[in-house]
Amino acid sequence: MFNQGLSLEQAPPIDVPFRFFITAPLFAILISIVILSNDSSLIMNRYSNIAISVVHLFTLGVLSMVIIGAMQQMMPVLAGAVIKRPKIFATIIHLFLSFGTLFFSFYFIFDIKYFLNFATIYLAIGFFSFFIFSMVLLFKVKFVTPTVKAMRIFTIVGIITICLGLYLSMSHINLNITQYHYNIVNIHILFGIFGFALIIIMGVSFQVIPMFYVAKNFPKFIENKLPILLVSCLILFSIIELL
């Protein structure tokens, strides 16, 4: 193995990412409780309240928690984007995401509207704080690698995904389900899976896979163009979906 391009001395304290990593399994346990406590027909119906709760317990409580925790370690080490007060930053993001996810899932389980109000505020603060702050740091990086480019795209797509989620959340709060609501749902899902999750995995793989001698370096075209091509496909799908 080699550490070319890594800034290991800039890694944050281990408890910064670990608080996110430890929280993720707790949400996974909560998912299993919800699944075991409800009829399978509700779980299989993608538009049922229980299914929406389970999906977001995973995407917000497990997937996002792990990605955001890892990003706070990867940004300083892989990109050289140093968070000056990592413990304070991590604490704020972790608290807002944790409580926001709980309120969001509880709204769909118990149908208490105030929970969705709190969830929308908490998740908006948590996600926007993380993505905007990360974007500013990443766009200040001078030595731009394909991984840094992918991280930049990840923050932009993350903001789009959250904006779509906020639109859907506000639709439920205001009881204003428009004719485009389910089209926005489909776009939100694709941006979450192929934008938020896949792009960051792809970007980190550009550096980590060759680093551990799993495979040779990716072709430059793949490293530089594939994330942009993926986002272009997402935008094209969104336009077609709304027509």
PLM regions: where:
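Hydrophobic alpha-helical transmembrane segments of multi-pass integral membrane proteins
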Residues: M1-L243
